[in-house]
């Protein structure tokens, strides 16, 4: 019976018995071969030498050996007396088909499980990327007009503050370190962009005219009564509004960062020392001299200056919020009294009626990018109009720089003339229509057709109205790990504003100078009706924080830019955007290259010190009246390309700093 079972097993396997691969690797004796003589044992060295012999390659051996059916170790026992050919009693194809089917079913289960798992993991990762908090603190940039304030912004980000938290702290810091440019007694505008959701908010805290201010009073006495120049400050309301929307750290903690700078002291910057030496307010008060000229003369750059008075103000604001500034408390009374004592008409009611505006920025498409900038009374539409006009020129690396400069100069003449028509749209509905025209590609094509490629226009193509703007301004640019971009520009108007300083140390602005009125000075263009003085109105502004992002998708170039210099700032921003988005230059090179600005009031084309004599001669040959100046404006910037972020200051600024978090 055992023999029959063995025979039956062998018959079932037949010629399809499995191959014993161990038999192959051990090189068994073939059935027809004679027994080989015993092979002596080799040592380890001899074995290594044998394996290294090229003639003992196993593949060569297998090819040369006369392999018949190699009996497996399991079948050799029952094959001593049997025929090598036996009847197959089981259909091998049926068995194979059944086995294959089972294998396919198992494979299907495995593949399905893997795909399901991979899909689940992918969906989870995508949701984490879009909706989860950053897992690692990395990648960000801060740029401001003072190195101390840049480092403060980085410090806030390092403590898990939001991009807006960092911007608020840095802006308040600039009011301490750069009091000639910005401060609690001024105003500004902030543009916040959420990269993930592609949403933007413009927080406009531009100063507004007091309710009792009249044009006639300014015409008569603006030079002798600095109190008339004071608008209702918007800085505190605007920063608080931004923090309410996007802040992460407590308001009091954010203000405490800046208060520490005022309390501990800071090194006087080159720009502040120069402003105190060359541009002190006319008829500076004793309080101003005590604060900024404690030794009777301007401090030297690098000397230590403390502002415990502002530290105390920030502590009060951190505890009680904007109400301490606007609701009739001691701070309000001090500001009203200081302005009225100098001939002003501002009242407590003006402060209580003030509110920051939350708006959408204007938007244009340029070279595959969205360009976001402030809406009127700011001149963002004129900036986008300039880009729309330039987009139609063949501006490539093959075009000479001189030819490109001519096109830029003629384009900016048009854009600045358009800007002179803007004002507060709440008081004039035609301004909204003008804004829509400036954003139109069709209008841009028309203006482009009016530009002569080889000759400057002998007369302006458009009527020109009076253009005024804050010559000094402070910039804060943030790209944080939270995927928010913040661009902010603030100002007091003239250096140190009106020159009026309260007992608490708050410098008051002179923003009413940005309105237009008749007979202001000799040789001024016609006053702009759109920018005339009215109670509660906000004057025309060249504060232009600007953000750029890809028009489609998330990947590509993002920019945050700001500028000072009033109308010169608009010219500077246009040329930097041209360098980055059209000529594909890096941000550092784009900020460093020479810039120009057409002064519409004098009909002079101003160029900065980076221009060569050859470039100036080319422009003069085209009919431009060129005036070379040292610096036109400072344009700072931050750039993000995919996951790489960098903050860059304008090299013309001796004190600004950009810092990048890696």
Curated annotation (Swiss-Prot):
EC number(s) from the headed UniProt entry: 3.4.19.13, 2.3.2.2
Known pathway: Sulfur metabolism; glutathione metabolism
Subcellular location as annotated: Membrane
Cytoplasmic face residues: 1-106
Chain spans, region Disordered: 26-90
GO annotation (BP), single: negative regulation of response to oxidative stress
InterPro entries xrefs: GGT_lsub_C, GGT_peptidase, GGT_ssub, Ntn_hydrolases_N
Biased amino acid composition, Low complexity: 72-83
Topology within the bilayer: Single-pass type II membrane protein
Regions of this protein lying in the Extracellular compartment: 128-662
Catalytic activity: an N-terminal (5-L-glutamyl)-[peptide] + an alpha-amino acid = 5-L-glutamyl amino acid + an N-terminal L-alpha-aminoacyl-[peptide]; glutathione + H2O = L-cysteinylglycine + L-glutamate; an S-substituted glutathione + H2O = an S-substituted L-cysteinylglycine + L-glutamate
Transmembrane segments: 107-127
Alphabetic keyword roster: Acyltransferase, Glutathione biosynthesis, Glycoprotein, Hydrolase, Membrane, Phosphoprotein, Signal-anchor, Transferase, Transmembrane, Transmembrane helix, Zymogen
Function: Hydrolyzes and transfers gamma-glutamyl moieties from glutathione and other gamma-glutamyl compounds to acceptors.
Assembly and binders: Heterodimer composed of the light and heavy chains. The active site is located in the light chain.
The protein's name: Glutathione hydrolase 7
Organism: Bos taurus (Bovine)
């Amino acid at each position: 019976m055992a023999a029959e079972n063995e025979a039956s097993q062998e018959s079932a396997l037949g010629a399809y018995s499995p191959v014993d691969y161990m038999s192959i690797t051990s090189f068994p004796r073939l059935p027809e071969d004679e027994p080989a003589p015993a092979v002596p044992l080799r040592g380890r060295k001899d074995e290594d030498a044998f394996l290294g012999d090229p003639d003992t390659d196993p593949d060569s051996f297998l090819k040369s050996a006369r392999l018949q059916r190699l009996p497996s170790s399991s079948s050799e026992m029952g094959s001593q007396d049997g025929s090598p050919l036996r009847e197959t009693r089981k259909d091998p194809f049926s068995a194979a088909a059944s086995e294959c089917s089972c294998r396919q079913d198992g494979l299907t289960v495995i593949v399905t499980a893997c795909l399901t798992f991979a899909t689940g993991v992918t969906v989870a990762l995508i949701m984490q990327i879009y909706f989860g908090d950053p897992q690692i603190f990395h990648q960000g940039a801060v740029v401001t007009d003072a190195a101390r304030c840049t480092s403060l912004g980085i410090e806030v980000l390092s403590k898990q503050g939001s991009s807006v938290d960092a911007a608020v702290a840095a802006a308040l810091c600039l009011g301490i370190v750069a009091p000639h440019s910005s401060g609690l007694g001024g105003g500004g505008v902030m543009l916040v962009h959420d990269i993930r959701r592609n949403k933007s908010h413009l927080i406009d805290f531009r100063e507004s005219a007091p309710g009792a201010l009249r044009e006639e009073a300014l015409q008569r006495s603006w030079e002798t009564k600095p109190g008339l120049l004071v608008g209702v400050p918007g800085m505190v309301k605007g920063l608080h509004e931004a923090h309410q929307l996007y802040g992460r750290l407590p308001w009091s903690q954010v203000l405490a960062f800046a208060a520490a700078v005022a309390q501990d002291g800071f090194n006087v910057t080159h720009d502040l020392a120069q402003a105190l030496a060359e541009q002190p307010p006319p008829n500076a008060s004793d309080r101003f001299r005590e604060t900024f000229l404690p030794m009777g003369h301007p401090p030297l750059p690098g000397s230590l200056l403390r502002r415990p008075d502002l530290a105390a103000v920030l502590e009060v604001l951190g505890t009680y919020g904007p109400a301490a500034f606007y609701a009739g408390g001691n701070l309000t009374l001090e500001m009203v009294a200081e302005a009225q004592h100098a001939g002003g008409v501002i009242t407590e009611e003006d402060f209580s009626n003030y509110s920051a505006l939350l708006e959408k920025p204007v938007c244009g498409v340029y070279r595959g990018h969205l360009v976001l900038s402030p809406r009127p009374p700011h001149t963002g539409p004129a900036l986008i109009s300039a880009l729309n006009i330039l987009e139609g020129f063949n501006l490539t690396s093959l075009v000479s720089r001189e030819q490109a400069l001519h096109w830029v100069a003629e384009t900016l003449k048009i854009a600045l003339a358009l800007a002179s028509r803007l004002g507060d749209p709440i008081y004039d509905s035609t301004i909204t229509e003008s804004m829509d025209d400036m954003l139109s590609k069709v209008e841009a094509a028309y203006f482009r057709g009016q530009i002569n490629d080889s000759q400057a226009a002998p007369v302006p193509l458009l009527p020109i109205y009076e253009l005024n703007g804050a010559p000094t301004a402070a910039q804060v640019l943030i790209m944080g790990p939270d995927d928010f971009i913040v661009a902010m520009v603030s100002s007091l108007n003239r250096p140190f504003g009106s020159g009026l300083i309260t007992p608490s140390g708050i410098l008051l602005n002179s923003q009413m100078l940005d309105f237009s009125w008749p007979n202001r000075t000799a040789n001024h263009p016609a006053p702009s009706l759109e920018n005339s003085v009215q109670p509660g109105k906000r004057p025309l502004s060249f504060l232009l924080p600007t953000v750029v992002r890809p028009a489609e998708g998330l990947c590509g170039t993002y920019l945050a830019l700001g500028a000072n210099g009033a109308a010169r700032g608009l010219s500077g921003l246009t040329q930097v955007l041209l360098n980055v988005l059209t000529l594909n230059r890096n941000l550092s090179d784009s900020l460093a290259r020479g810039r120009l600005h057409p002064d519409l009031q004098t009909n002079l084309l101003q160029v900065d010190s980076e221009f060569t004599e050859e470039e100036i001669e080319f422009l003069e040959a085209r009919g431009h009246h060129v005036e070379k100046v040292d610096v036109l404006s400072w344009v700072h910037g931050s750039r993000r390309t995919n996951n790489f972020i960098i903050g860059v200051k304008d090299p013309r600024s001796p004190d600004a700093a950009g810092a990048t978090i890696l």
